[in-house]
């Protein structure tokens, strides 16, 4: 009777969700033992992190590690599958698998049943000290056998598919894995309306335009991995090959000033990128470890853009070779009350780029960044712990034909954590230097349209950032609470800049990094277990952003999320609602307005089969708006994106074991392409 009443109440309330789930158990009573909090549930706190053992519901109603993470009892957790970012209370989390850094797409081949536990670090230390928040998936270890696993996703409403296959064989301490996959997007019908104003000394140009987009994108990848592991000692070697191609990104329509003119643009891109990774974790003694990493990557990139607006025409061809490597060494020592670590990193990039068409230019650019840190953690009492991480960052780069840039900057990170009876309070302070992208540091100049050009900016000022926040997490029987207040100050932030080029009669869009930027935010997140098979989650978020550089901009935003998770035998139902928001892009100085986003997923899971159907904003096509308002130029843009609403997707996954059971190895494929090219997208 209680279950029937709860079900009726949930259906009447019809409250939607976002990406979180309360597990079957909650903390009813806790008992502190030194820095370990032993709980009467599947969640406990050990020092600077939570240890979470996913329960049967959280495993059953997930297709992979991504789904398990969505189902965990972490208030304020939001996962953006398109951008591959995990946000917890406004802070970006870094994902690890068995102590190795990865991203969301890298764990899509990890079966929920093979996850032993998940470590959630809200005060990272040791090898994780460089991260704000950490989610580390720990998988079960097996000795013999293998598996074959396949999954596929297909959308309805626009044409998109994502298909993957993996096979793994384990014998003793050795594991051999092959991943392969492909995805594509064929999208037609995205519409853009744009009202632009260009202020020239003798005249003001008002311009209206409309365009419809046709987009084609294809991606293929493969990876071979070998791993040898014995206890806490392991080393892993990986070879990855990624091929990206955008054969068509065409927009056609009209532009109207004094007369109406047809406009057409098309962008073609392709990249081929092999990558080698070597990682090792070496226990030196019972309380000492050494972690080593060597990574190398090469990318061959090409970019072609054609823009026509009679009688004006602009064409840009860009070819680039990019080479990068990374070295890391982390030493850790830990005891009952103290721990320390020494970290050394070096990142090196070299780019060679040829521009042709309207811009004839050859560029050679190299960048090196070396970092050294010393961290010390002290358990002052059963409840109070202190962490200090200090270091130096030496950043250098040189663009051919320009002066070299060199900056030696301090890095400081201090955390104070206090354990409460039913929660935790954390204060964090960070002082870091900013590191700008190499697509900014160049002298290329390309045509955007008949009134505007875009160019890079190699002369940048030294800059630094200060970030501090106060974070609270508490659990009270059925209720989980998280709250955070954050302040960020950027000295010499990088922003878009505009000026008039009288010689060419064009407005030039470039970059500058003077002035400062400030950001304030506050978030309150709640989760409540309604009954045995359902839980409710939600949050409210406020932020204020202000930029004072060549131009001054500010924005206030209040938004929130609601969610409901229901588990009924082999089925799960997860409706969600994201309220609309207004955001300031602090770099582009553009304000955007996103409407309410809602949807629902329904899944079936039994044995090795998982099927999920998702519907996104089915009743109305979303229209996102953008504003840029500067004295020299401004625009008001409205976009109806075919991939943002009125579509559904179906996902099917199946795995087959052979021999004895083995763990499902995480898919560790980074599909990002290294590039320094200046582009108009």
Which residues make up each language-model segment?
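N-terminal periplasmic accessory domains that precede
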Residues: 35, 65-68, 85, 120, ...
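Flexible loop and strand-edge segments within Gram-negative outer membrane beta-barrel domains
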Residues: 185-324, 350-351, 363-365, 444-448, ...
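Short, polar/charged loop or turn motifs at beta-strand boundaries
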Residues: 25, 49-72, 96-98, 152-156
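Short, acidic, small-residue-rich periplasmic hinge/interaction motif at the N-terminus
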Residues: 21-58, 81-83
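Exposed, low-structure sequence patches enriched in small/polar residues
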Residues: 62, 73, 101-110, 114-120, ...
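Periplasmic plug
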Residues: 78-123
């Amino acid at each position: 009777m209680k279950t029937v009443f709860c079900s009726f109440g949930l259906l009447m309330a019809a409250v939607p969700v976002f990406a979180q789930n309360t597990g079957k158990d909650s903390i009813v009573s806790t008992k502190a033992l030194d820095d370990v909090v032993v709980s009467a549930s599947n969640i406990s706190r050990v020092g600077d992190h939570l240890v979470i053992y996913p329960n049967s519901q959280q495993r059953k109603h997930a297709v992979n590690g991504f789904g398990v993470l969505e189902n965990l009892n972490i208030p304020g957790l939001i996962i953006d599958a398109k951008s591959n970012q995990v946000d917890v209370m406004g802070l970006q989390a870094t994902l690890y698998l068995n102590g190795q850094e990865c991203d969301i797409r890298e764990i899509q081949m990890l079966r929920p049943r093979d996850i032993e536990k998940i470590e959630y670090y809200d005060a990272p230390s040791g090898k994780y000290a460089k991260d704000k928040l950490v989610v580390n998936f720990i998988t079960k270890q097996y000795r013999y056998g293998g598996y074959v696993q396949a999954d596929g996703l297909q959308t309805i409403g626009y044409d998109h598919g994502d298909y993957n296959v993996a096979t793994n064989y384990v014998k003793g301490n050795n594991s051999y894995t092959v991943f392969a996959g492909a995805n594509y997007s064929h999208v037609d019908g995205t519409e853009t309306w744009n009202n632009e104003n260009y202020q020239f000394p003798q005249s003001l140009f008002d311009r209206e335009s409309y365009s419809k987009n046709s987009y084609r994108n294809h991606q293929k990848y493969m990876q071979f991995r070998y791993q040898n592991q014995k206890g806490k000692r392991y080393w892993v070697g990986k070879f990855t090959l990624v091929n990206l191609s955008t054969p068509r990104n065409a927009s056609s329509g009209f532009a109207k000033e004094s007369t109406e003119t047809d406009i057409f643009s098309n962008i073609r891109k392709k990249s081929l990128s092999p990558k080698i990774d070597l990682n090792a974790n070496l226990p030196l003694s019972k309380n000492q470890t050494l972690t080593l990493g060597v990574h190398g990557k090469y990318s061959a990139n090409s970019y072609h853009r054609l823009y026509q607006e009679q009688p004006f025409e602009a064409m840009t061809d860009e070819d680039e070779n990019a080479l990068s490597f990374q070295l890391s060494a982390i030493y850790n020592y830990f005891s009952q009350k103290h721990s320390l670590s020494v970290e050394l990193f070096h990142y090196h990039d070299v780019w060679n780029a040829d521009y042709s068409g309207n811009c004839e230019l050859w560029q050679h650019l190299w960048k090196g960044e070396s970092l050294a840190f010393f961290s010390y953690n002290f358990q002052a009492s059963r409840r109070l712990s202190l962490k200090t991480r200090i270091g130096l960052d030496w950043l250098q780069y040189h663009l051919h034909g320009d002066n070299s840039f060199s900056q030696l900057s301090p890095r400081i990170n201090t955390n104070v954590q206090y354990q409460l009876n039913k929660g935790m309070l954390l204060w964090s302070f960070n002082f870091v230097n900013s590191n700008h992208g190499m697509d900014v540091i160049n002298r290329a100049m390309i045509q955007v349209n008949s009134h505007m050009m875009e160019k890079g900016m190699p002369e940048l000022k030294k800059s630094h950032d200060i970030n501090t926040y106060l974070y609270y997490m508490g659990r009270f029987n059925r209720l989980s609470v998280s709250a955070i207040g954050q302040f960020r100050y950027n000295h010499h932030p990088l922003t878009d800049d505009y000026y008039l080029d009288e010689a060419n009669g064009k407005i030039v869009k470039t970059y500058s990094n003077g002035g400062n930027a400030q950001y304030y935010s506050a978030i309150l997140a709640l989760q409540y277990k309604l009954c045995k098979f359902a839980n409710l989650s939600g949050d409210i978020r406020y932020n204020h952003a202000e930029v004072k550089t060549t131009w001054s901009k500010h924005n206030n935003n209040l938004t929130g999320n609601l969610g409901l998770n229901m588990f009924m035998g082999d089925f799960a139902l997860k409706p969600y609602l994201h309220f609309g928001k207004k955001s300031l892009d602090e770099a582009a100085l553009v304000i955007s307005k996103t409407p309410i986003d809602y949807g629902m997923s329904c899944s079936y899971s039994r044995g090795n089969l998982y099927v999920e159907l998702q519907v996104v904003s089915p009743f109305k096509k979303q229209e996102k708006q953008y504003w840029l308002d500067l004295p020299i130029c401004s625009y008001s843009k409205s976009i109806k994106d075919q991939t943002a609403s009125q579509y559904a997707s179906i996902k099917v996954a199946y795995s087959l074991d052979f021999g004895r059971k083995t763990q499902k190895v995480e898919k560790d494929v980074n599909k990002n392409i290294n590039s320094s090219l200046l582009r108009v997208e």
